[in-house]
Amino acid sequence: MLSLVLMLLAVITAASAMYLTVQNRSEEIALRRAIGSSRWLICRSFILEGLIVGITAGSLGGIIGNLTTLCVSWIQTWPPVLPPELWLVGLFLGAATGILSAIYPAWVASRKDPAIAIRG
């Protein structure tokens, strides 16, 4: 249960950060829309950005988790237990978190009116 709450917190935090990115890049988004980029292309670029951030975070989390497990096992003189599928779980959860957190900001970015956004 705690892990679900932490995942929800991670999605909300990442979505807030992505939303702020969309707000800061509103002129760029408006310019892309004005020169003919489709709403789907704008949406896709932000979802891809979220996916890349999520996979990077999942990879770093896996590396830090494995190093921590190895250090604690070495200090306690326990045999380390590191199932290889945990890397895949970390990558999948990171990717899912990145995509989920990018959906709403991507939708907001794709709905911006270019004329209003360029004016400021």
Tell what function each PLM region has.
Residues 1-8, 82, 86:
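Loop-to-helix entry region at the N-terminal start of transmembrane alpha-helices
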Residues 6-9, 19, 27-73, 77, ...:
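Transmembrane alpha-helical interface segments in multi-pass membrane proteins
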Residues 13-16:
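Amphipathic alpha-helical repeat scaffolds
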Residues 107-120:
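Short cytosolic juxtamembrane segments of multi-pass membrane proteins
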